[in-house]
Structure formats: structure tokens, C-alpha cells
Amino acid sequence: MRINILNILAGLAILTLLTFLKVHLNGNEEFSIAEELFSKNNYAKATTHYERAIQWHIPGSSTPTLAAEKLWHISLFYESKNQTNEALKTCRLLRGAFYSTRSFFTPGKKWINLCNEKVAHWMASKPDLINEAPLSFESRKNKFLNNLQADRSPYT
């Protein structure tokens, strides 16, 4: 009986290790593809692969952080070129990638908070078509920021 329990525990440990290895390798592969696309200035496709690299998140891996940095720089690049919609899309991808890996904890809170600030700013910069008496920029920014920062549990 004792040997059966040890065999079961050993099997579970091996399966867990192999799962972590697969997640780590797939994250690195997605990051490599993204880096290649980024070097060719194909930012649209690179953002997809950086997002996937973040979604292959395991605690202790540096790949999601490196991918997040790249996505952040791409969004700032778009902002500098006055391509606000692309910057907004990239920032939302970055934010959403970390939220999609959420379970007992939320990884990438630093990046989520940075994205919340930027998204609120960009959204508030757009014309206010909803309110009869348009709100001030700061009022709209705070409204968007409060909405983005609201803690919502993951859908199950």
C-alpha cells in the first residue's frame, strides 16, 4: 500500500514538473517569435505573440515581465506617433494578458496599474459624446480610472 501511494505521488510530481516545463518552453517560444517580428518592425503581429508569452505565465519566470516591457514600449511608440487607437489597443492587450492568467493572485499588478492610467488618459482625451454637458478632462479620466481599477473577481 505504501509503495502505491509513493508511486502516485511520484507520478503527480512528474506530471506537475512536465506541465511547468511545457508552460515555460511555450512562453519562451512565443517571446522568441515576438522578438523576431519586433526586429522586423511588424509591431501588430509582435503584440499578439508578446501577449501569448504573458499568458504562458508561471511564477518565477522572467518571460512575462520581458514581454510586458516590450508591449509597454510598443504602446508608447504608438502614442509618440499620435496613433492613439493602436496605443490603446496595445495597452489593453497588456492589461488583459495579465488578467487572463489570474487565479489565486493577479500577476503583473504593476503593469495593470500603468495601463489603467494610460487607458484612462487616452479614453478621456476622446470627445465626450455621451453627456449633454461635456465633463472636464479630469472628471472623465477619473471616471474611466475608477472603472478600470474596480476589483472584479474572475468569471468562473
Language-model regions: role of each:
Residues 26, 31, 38-39, 79:
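Hydrophobic/aromatic side-chain positions at a characteristic register within alpha-helices
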Residues 4-24:
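Hydrophobic membrane-insertion alpha-helices, especially the h-region
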Residues 30, 37, 49, 90-93:
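Alpha-helical solenoid repeat scaffolds, predominantly canonical TPR units
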Residues 43-44, 84:
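TPR-repeat structural position
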Residues 56-58, 97-105, 126:
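Alpha-helical junction/boundary sensor with strong preference for TPR arrays
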Residues 27, 34-35, 68, 72-75, ...:
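Conserved small-residue packing positions in alpha-helical repeats and bundles
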Residues 51-96:
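Extracytoplasmic/periplasmic/luminal assembly and interaction segments
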